C-alpha cells in the first residue's frame, strides 16, 4: 500500500515543486502538498493511487 503522510496539511500555500502524485479520483496532483490539501477537502475520502502522473 502506498501512502503519503498528510499530518502537516492542509497548508494555505503550496510550494511550486513538481513531484506528481495520482489520486484515487484519477487526477494528477502536482505535489504532495496539493494532494494533501485535496485529501483535507474531501474529508479523507481521497486516497493515493500511486506516485507519478495518472
Swiss-Prot record:
It is found in: Secreted. GO terms for molecular function: serine-type endopeptidase inhibitor activity. SMART domains: KAZAL. The record marks 16-17 as: Reactive bond 3. Its main location: secreted. CDD domains: KAZAL_FS. Glycans are attached at residue 43. It comes from the Eukaryota. Keywords: Disulfide bond, Glycoprotein, Protease inhibitor, Repeat, Secreted, Serine protease inhibitor. Residues 4-54 form the Kazal-like domain. Disulfide bonds join 6-36, 14-33, 22-54. SUPFAM superfamilies: Kazal-type serine protease inhibitors (SSF100895). One of its GO terms (cellular component) is extracellular region. Avian ovomucoid consists of three homologous, tandem Kazal family inhibitory domains. PANTHER family: OVOMUCOID-LIKE-RELATED, SERINE PEPTIDASE INHIBITOR, KAZAL TYPE 2, TANDEM DUPLICATE 1-RELATED. This is Ovomucoid.
